[in-house]
Amino acid sequence: MPIRHCIVHLIDKKPDGSPAVLHARDSELAESAAIENMLADLNESYNAKQGKAWGLFHPESGAFPFSGWLKEYLDGGQDFTAFSRVAVEHLQKLMEESNLSVGGHVLFAHYQQGMTDYLAIALLHHSEGVAVTDQLDVTPSRHLDLGQLHLAARINISEWQNNKQSKQYISFIKGKNGKKVSEYFRDFIGCQEGVDGPGETRTLLKAFSDFVESEDLPEDSAREKTKTLVDYASSQAKLGEPMGLEELSELIDEDRPKAFYDHIRNKDYGLSPEIPADKRTLNQFRRFTGRAEGLSISFEAHLLGSKIEYDEEAGTLIIKGLPTQLTDQLKRRN
């Protein structure tokens, strides 16, 4: 993962309405194994984060100037340090307007992954821990807590520059229940949601369920194809990449690589050729689970409609082919 440019600034602010104080670095960070490891860990944590949203820049304006500064940097009008400085000053201003915001170290990293250029921006915080010294003493130790990543965004620069129709070249952590505490960070990037990740994923899963039903597949085959879909989607989510419908179709049925793709197009589900994978929605698709008053039920989603029938009006489940272990226990009860 070649790192083109990387810099860190510090905004010191407490969530009490006090002014935000900027401590800006005046030069880029030199290449090092530590920087590479930090960015690799950041990407891993970011990709694993649930609740991300995908979108595109608002038209450049006084309210949303970030995309203009980024374009100026990419066009050679200013260097990376100057770009990050004007951007972090804008973030500082928005922080002061948001009483709930807290400061932290602001990372800007322009890097390449494969043939694609990305810009990652993250607000990082420290955690207090302990370490053992060479003299075997235990001493306090501070470290960047990349596992607790709450404000971060990643811009696919290549997609932004080369695909003017794209509405998903920016991803950002949306926050639980769309918390307003993170809105200032989204406004800092100047991002508007262009793709409903959970909604698109739900539509894809609905299309897949319809496909399996229309093909009248045996249970083993349905289970195998379900696993293929979920594994592929989870893998793409881990990489931070969207799911390609044509690629997915080829994986689902190698003998008929276009079958699922043609099903999606013919039924007009309205899906884009590439969609972001929402991990929370995928996890719900794997299994249905529920627990109440001493009763716990969990079953694989593909069993619904075959071994398990749901009567919505009566609020009942009918289970066919009970596990032998369960029937033995029930028999022993008598």
Curated annotation (Swiss-Prot):
The keyword Cytoplasm applies. It is found in: Cytoplasm, Nucleoid. The keyword Acyltransferase does not apply. Its main location: cytoplasm. Coiled coil: none annotated. GO terms for cellular component: bacterial nucleoid; cytoplasm. GO terms for molecular function: double-stranded DNA binding; single-stranded RNA binding. It holds the Pfam family NA37. Keywords: Cytoplasm. Belongs to the YejK family. PANTHER family: NUCLEOID-ASSOCIATED PROTEIN YEJK (PTHR38772:SF1), PTHR38772. This is Nucleoid-associated protein PFL_1060. It comes from Pseudomonas fluorescens (strain ATCC BAA-477 / NRRL B-23932 / Pf-5). The lineage of its organism: Bacteria, Pseudomonadati, Pseudomonadota, Gammaproteobacteria, Pseudomonadales.
